[in-house]
């Protein structure tokens, strides 16, 4: 009786971890959209460096390599973004 209970509880843990992965994926897509707006807004007088640091912290907190890679790819343009980056949607 207890062995069957243990097996069923292990199955529940696997299903929970799968649902957490799906929610992480949906969170990463929304974070990538916000990251695009941060990259476009760099150099518009809103503190490009501050935006880069905020994006990095957000990527690390979500724990997905996709966001961290995207942030690292855009850090150079955020830090050196000129006024011609303003108004990007």
Swiss-Prot record:
Domain of life: Eukaryota
Disulfide bond annotation, renumbered to this chain: none
UniProt-listed InterPro entries: HssA/B-related
UniProt similarity note: Belongs to the hssA/B family.
Listed name of the protein: HssA/B-like protein 20
Gene from which this protein is expressed: hssl20
């Amino acid at each position: 009786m207890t062995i069957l209970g243990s097996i069923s509880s292990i199955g529940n843990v696997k299903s929970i971890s799968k649902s957490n992965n799906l929610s992480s994926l949906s969170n990463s897509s929304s974070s990538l959209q916000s990251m695009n707006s941060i990259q476009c807004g760099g150099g518009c007088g809103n503190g490009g460096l501050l935006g880069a640091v905020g994006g990095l912290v957000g990527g690390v907190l979500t724990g997905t390599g996709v966001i961290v890679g995207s942030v690292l790819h855009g850090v150079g343009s955020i830090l050196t973004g000129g006024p011609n980056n303003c108004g990007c949607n």
